[in-house]
C-alpha cells in the first residue's frame, strides 16, 4: 500500500499545517499517510472508500482522515478537493486541546464524514485561502496566524456540521443524503422522505440535482450500485444476494443497470476483469 510522507507536502519541517488542492482529484489507489488531513469536497462526485467502507461524496462533504486510516478514491466525476493537512492534533506550536473539536471514535464507530451547506463551504474556502497565502512565511507571527485560522476552520465545521445545524433546507438535504447512506437498501418513497426531512418534493428534487447533478432516483440507484460493486469486490455473496441486499428486487434489472453504470457486468467485477484486483 502506498504511504504518503509529510516531507513531500509540508513546506518546512516546522510547518504544522499545509494546503494541498486536488483540482480535480482523479481515481487514486488505497493509501495512508504519516500525517492527518481534512478533505473538503468543493464539487463533483466520487466514491471515497474509507477503511474498507464506501461513501458517496459530493460538494459539501468533509472527511476527517487520521494517519492510520487507509482510503482511496474511485469513480470520480469532476471531483475537486482541498486537503488541509496537519501533522497531529498535538503537534501545534500555539494550540492545545484540538482533539476535542475533531470527530471521536466511540465503540469502534468513527464519524469520519460530515456535511456542510453551500454558504458554509464558501466560508471554509475563505479560511483555507488565507492559510494558503501564508504558507511561505515561517516566522512566529505567521505560524501563529495559520494555527489560529486552522482553529477557526475546526470551529466552523463543528458548528455547521449536520449534527448541529438543521435550520435551513440545504442542511436538511445534507441530512437526507447522510440518511440515504444508511438506508439505501430500503424501499424509498420520495414523498415520505421529503416529509421526513421537512422539504417539499420540488425543493428536494431541485437541490439534490444542484448538489449532485442527479435526480433523486438516479442518485439512489447510483448509490446502490456503488455499494453493490464494493460487495462484489470484497465479499463472497452471490450476485443475486448482493442485488437484494442493495435494494434491487430483480437481479436481471440490477445487472442491466450495473453494466450501464460501469461498462462491466457484475460477474466481470467479481472476477477482477476491470483491473481493480490485479
Curated annotation (Swiss-Prot):
It holds the Pfam family HTH_18. SMART domains: HTH_ARAC. GO terms for biological process: positive regulation of DNA-templated transcription; rhamnose metabolic process. It comes from the Bacteria. GO terms for cellular component: cytoplasm. GO terms for molecular function: DNA-binding transcription factor activity; sequence-specific DNA binding. It is found in: Cytoplasm. Residues 191-212, 239-262 bind DNA. Residues 174-272 form the HTH araC/xylS-type domain. InterPro entries: AraC-bd, AraC_XylS_family_regulators, Homeodomain-like_sf, HTH-like, HTH_AraC, HTH_AraC-typ_CS, RhaR_RhaS-like_N, RmlC-like_jellyroll. The record marks 241, 250 as: Interaction with sigma-70. Its main location: cytoplasm. PANTHER family: HTH-TYPE TRANSCRIPTIONAL ACTIVATOR RHAS, HTH-TYPE TRANSCRIPTIONAL ACTIVATOR RHAS-RELATED. Activates expression of the rhaBAD and rhaT operons. Binds DNA as a dimer. This is HTH-type transcriptional activator RhaS. The lineage of its organism: Bacteria, Pseudomonadati, Pseudomonadota, Gammaproteobacteria, Enterobacterales. The gene is rhaS.
Amino acid at each position: 500500500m502506498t504511504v504518503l510522507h509529510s516531507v513531500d507536502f509540508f513546506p518546512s519541517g516546522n510547518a504544522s499545517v499545509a494546503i494541498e488542492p486536488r483540482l480535480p482529484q482523479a481515481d487514486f489507489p488505497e493509501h495512508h499517510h504519516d500525517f492527518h488531513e481534512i478533505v473538503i469536497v468543493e464539487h463533483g462526485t466520487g466514491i471515497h472508500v474509507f477503511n474498507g467502507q464506501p461513501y458517496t461524496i459530493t460538494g459539501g462533504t468533509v472527511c476527517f482522515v487520521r494517519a492510520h486510516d487507509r482510503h482511496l478514491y474511485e469513480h470520480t466525476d469532476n471531483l475537486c478537493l482541498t486537503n488541509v493537512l496537519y501533522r497531529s492534533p498535538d503537534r501545534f506550536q500555539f494550540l492545545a486541546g484540538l482533539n476535542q473539536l475533531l470527530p471521536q471514535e466511540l465503540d469502534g464507530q468513527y464519524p469520519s464524514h460530515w456535511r456542510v451547506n453551500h454558504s458554509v463551504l464558501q466560508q471554509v474556502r475563505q479560511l483555507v485561502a488565507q492559510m494558503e497565502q501564508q504558507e511561505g512565511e515561517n516566522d512566529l507571527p505567521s505560524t501563529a496566524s495559520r494555527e489560529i485560522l486552522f482553529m477557526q476552520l475546526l470551529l466552523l465545521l463543528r458548528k455547521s456540521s449536520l449534527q448541529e445545524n438543521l435550520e435551513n433546507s440545504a442542511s436538511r438535504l445534507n441530512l437526507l443524503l447522510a440518511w440515504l447512506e444508511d438506508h439505501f437498501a430500503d424501499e424509498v418513497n420520495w414523498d415520505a422522505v421529503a416529509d421526513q426531512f421537512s422539504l417539499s418534493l420540488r425543493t428536494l428534487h431541485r437541490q439534490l440535482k444542484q448538489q449532485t447533478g442527479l435526480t433523486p432516483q438516479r442518485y439512489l440507484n447510483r448509490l446502490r450500485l456503488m455499494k453493490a460493486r464494493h460487495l462484489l469486490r470484497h465479499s463472497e455473496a452471490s450476485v443475486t444476494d448482493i442485488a437484494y441486499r442493495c435494494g434491487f428486487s430483480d437481479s436481471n434489472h440490477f445487472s442491466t443497470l450495473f453494466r450501464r453504470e460501469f461498462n462491466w457486468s457484475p460477474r466481470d467485477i467479481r472476477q477482477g476483469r476491470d483491473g481493480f484486483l490485479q
